[in-house]
């Protein structure tokens, strides 16, 4: 009986790993900014003076940022452990990133150039990484651990 050891993370898998690590860093920084803003007494006074819908939107945005950070952290750990579920969850994570980029493009009061650039980077990464994760024999040979 022969057992094959899983391949190491390398080759073209370093690109998706780098994208994941940069996303983890950016979501961590976003959470730090949210926390810094929410820890200020002036923020509570300002939010208290806003409409209830604005307060709810702030809360939903903060909870979404926490959920995305947690999911990105979990996926990064699973990526390094070469778990079998990584390709499926990486694709789900990319689709969530596309949805958030489309939301930012459509609804945020951000300059169009910044929103378009964020949307294009996310769409390009998704268009390149999803077929690679679905069809690559290297991906199938790397992510084999339960």
Curated annotation (Swiss-Prot):
Cytoplasmic topology ranges: 1-12, 81-89, 134-146
Location(s) in or outside the cell: Cell inner membrane
Source domain of life: Bacteria
Protein's UniProt keywords contain Secreted: no
Broad class of where this protein is predominantly found: membrane
Chain segments annotated as transmembrane: 13-33, 60-80, 90-110, 113-133
Pfam families registered for this protein in UniProt: DUF2569 (PF10754)
Keywords: Cell inner membrane, Cell membrane, Membrane, Transmembrane, Transmembrane helix
One cellular component term from this protein's GO annotations in UniProt: plasma membrane
Mode of membrane association: Multi-pass membrane protein
Residue ranges annotated as Periplasmic topological domain: 34-59, 111-112
Homology family: To Synechocystis PCC 6803 sll0481.
Protein name in the entry: Inner membrane protein YdgK
Organism: Escherichia coli (strain K12)
Gene that encodes it: ydgK
